[in-house]
Amino acid sequence: MEDVTELVLKAQKGDEIAMENIVNMFRPKVSAISREYFLVGGGLDDIIQEGMIGLFKAVYGYKPDKNHSFSAFASLCIEHQIQT
C-alpha cells in the first residue's frame, strides 16, 4: 500500500483513485471527530459531511515540505471545518 503522502500528492494532481483511497483511509477519523461535536437533536450526517469537506481541504492544502504529518494536518482541518 502506498504511503499517505504519496497518495496526497497524487490526489493534488487530480488522481481520483488516490483521493478515493484517502477518503476510505480517513473515514473512521472523520466519523470519530464528528461524534465529538454531535449534539442530540442535531444531524450527525451533516457534521460528517462537514468533516469530509475539511478532509478535502486538507488534501489540497497539505505541503509535505512542512514538518508535520498529513494525519495531524487533516485532523486540524476536519475539526476546523466542523467548528465553522
Question: What name fits each language-model region?
Answer:
Residues 1-84:
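Alpha-helical promoter-recognition and RNA polymerase-docking modules of transcription initiation factors
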